[in-house]
Amino acid sequence: MAHPMATHPRLQRRHGARSGSSRCRHRRPVPRRRSRSRPRWRAARAHRRHHRRSGPGIGDHPADRARHRRGGRLPAQPRRAAARRPDPRGGANTDHHAAPRHRRAAAGTSHRRRDRLASNDSQHHAHPTATGPRPRTTVRRRRQPRITHPVGTADHRTRTALRRPRPADQLSAALRSALEETRRLSGLADQLLTLARADRPESHPSAKAVPITPLLHESVARFAATGADITTRAEPDLFVSIDPDHLRRILTAVLDNAITHGDGEIAVTAHARDGAVDIGVRDHGPGFADHFLPVAFDRFTRADTARGGRGSGLGLAIVAALTTTHGGHANATNHPDGGAELRITLPTPRPPFHEELPRITSSDTKDPNREHDTSDQ
């Protein structure tokens, strides 16, 4: 017999009782309790997100997981304070794990950039280059503007002249300017080729006994035709051991340097001294700056602050390279009476060898014993 309260309509509507139901009608059913733990798939997804965001943590390594399955203990968890970084603005420390995701990412990026800059700065201080030889990258950085500037200038002026119709005088001026830059580029290419050949011993031409006086007067006459005031004083019958083309380049470079940066009269001297010939070129300009003298013969180096100009910085470098190739040396100084002075020392040719004596063969010699035997007969 059913409980009398179980047949009440309100209780039946509340508990969902039905006629013929097997549910116990006198007891209120207990609802299922919802679990507070997340589903496994959701926990795995959160773990993967954290792993991608912060990298593998303690216990994530396969060896740690295997140790945990065997009942072993995982390594000790780091303290939360270890994850706190000092605030670069001088404020309180920032807990990156407690901050939102976008702030954590921004803070991590800034710290990584700061660490990278600090590492680069420490490497720079650990390997200084100011006291050692200049690296090749420095030479390349100096070389690039010298090569690209004439090309860019000629290209720009030519395109500007052809952009729209212009009067004949403006077009002629633009073309003359482009031609000047083209000549500068051609001269720069020639200088670079000369330096490249000087660096290769197998490409050096054979040295000859060259009289210096005719070539010196030839170079001086070529520059004097442009209006330069040059005086020459050279001893007669001076010979140097060098290639004639290299000697012309050396004389042209030192005279061009004196005319470009000097002022007034230019004095050229040549005399013999200690088995060599000393060539001196002195101008009456402001002279070399003290800081420029140690690097006067370096490539792509110019004393712009002291002597101004638009040179390529290769003239004196070519002089030093060609002089050293033939066993000489170059020196740059300031004259005591004012002005800059360049001195080139070149070796004199070796004295000619004596003529070889005729070789004595066996047929020319006579056996004294044989002569004695013949006389006896």
Swiss-Prot record:
SMART domains linked: HATPase_c
Compositional bias ranges of the Basic residues kind: 10-54, 99-115, 137-146
The biased composition feature labelled Basic and acidic residues covers: 84-98, 352-377
Recorded catalytic activity of this chain's protein: ATP + protein L-histidine = ADP + protein N-phospho-L-histidine
Mind listing the GO biological process terms from this record? Answer: phosphorelay signal transduction system
The GO terms describing molecular function are: ATP binding; protein histidine kinase activity
Where, per the database record, does this protein carry Phosphohistidine?
H149
Question: Sorted alphabetically, which CDD domains does this protein's record hold?
Answer: HATPase (cd00075)
Q: Name one Pfam family in it.
A: HATPase_c
- What residue ranges carry the coiled-coil annotation? none
Its domain of life reads Bacteria
User: Is Coiled coil one of the keywords?
Assistant: no
Q: Where is this region: Disordered?
A: 1-169, 346-377
Q: Where is the Histidine kinase domain?
A: 146-350
Q: What does this protein do?
A: Member of the two-component system HK/TcrA. Phosphorylates TcrA.
User: Extra notes?
Assistant: HK is composed of two separate proteins (HK1 and HK2) with a distinct N-terminal sequence in strain ATCC 25618 / H37Rv.
Which PANTHER family did the record assign? SENSOR PROTEIN CREC
Q: What name goes with this protein?
A: Probable sensor histidine kinase HK
